[in-house]
């Protein structure tokens, strides 16, 4: 698979929606994730990321302007022991609760489907990072309608074992802007993952469409120790 330039991938599209990146730093020592949200409506743009325990949650920036919280207020990132869960919706909680009961990532997501926001039927994208005894594996998932038909849910899981240093994968909810919005297609895209968290966060943030970007979260986890550092960038400050 040919590597993409993530800067070019993001800057060439006004609205990829929500996006997840998972990978490994160039020096091989860090497990890396990034998650961004974008918005076209006032309700969707009225959000920030805030820390919540070891994870994050979305929160209304101006509570007085919050209209419908159902699909926009959730915890995108939660940590369950040596696993980090990243998603674009409340399926984070489904994965957390099911895996806490010894179910798998895939089993948890079989209980969920795409969002009910007709006619877009926004895909649910999810990822799980597993770090144990110096080993690091991850998986990514997308649940989407059958080419816009809500009668069928298509479920895809991509598992990556022993990820090479400096490589990662990117998945987003939409291919690009549109009406209705076209769901992401194909495998998660291969990209380079650098060592510098701040520089990577800045690159991603600067590449996202200025009008539509809302918030970005980046975390680098030390594979040997489990210690992590994170960065949150919110457009609303």
In which residue ranges do the predicted regions lie?
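Conserved short alpha-helical segments that host acidic/polar catalytic motifs at enzyme active sites
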Residues: 1-237
């Amino acid at each position: 698979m040919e590597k993409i330039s993530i800067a070019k991938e993001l800057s060439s599209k006004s609205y990829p929606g929500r996006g997840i990146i998972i990978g490994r730093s160039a020096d091989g020592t860090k497990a890396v994730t990034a998650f961004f949200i974008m918005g076209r409506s006032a309700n969707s743009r009225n959000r920030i990321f805030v820390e919540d325990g070891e994870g994050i949650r979305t929160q209304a920036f101006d509570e007085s302007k919050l209209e419908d919280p159902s699909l926009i207020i959730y915890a995108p990132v939660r940590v369950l022991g040596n696993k980090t869960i990243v998603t674009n919706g409340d399926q984070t909680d489904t994965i957390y609760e099911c895996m806490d009961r010894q179910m798998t990532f895939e089993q948890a997501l079989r209980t969920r489907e795409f969002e009910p926001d007709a006619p877009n039927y926004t895909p649910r994208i999810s990822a799980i990072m597993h770090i144990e005894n110096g080993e690091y594996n991850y998986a990514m998932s997308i649940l989407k309608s059958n080419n816009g038909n809500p009668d069928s849910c298509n479920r895809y899981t991509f598992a990556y074992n022993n990820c090479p240093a400096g490589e990662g994968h990117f998945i987003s909810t939409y291919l690009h802007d549109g009406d209705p919005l076209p769901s992401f297609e194909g495998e998660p895209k291969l990209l380079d993952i650098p060592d510098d968290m701040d520089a990577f966060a800045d690159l991603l943030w600067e590449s996202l469409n200025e009008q539509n970007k809302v918030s970005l979260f980046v975390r680098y986890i030390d594979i040997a120790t489990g210690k992590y550092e994170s960065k949150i960038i919110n457009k609303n400050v």
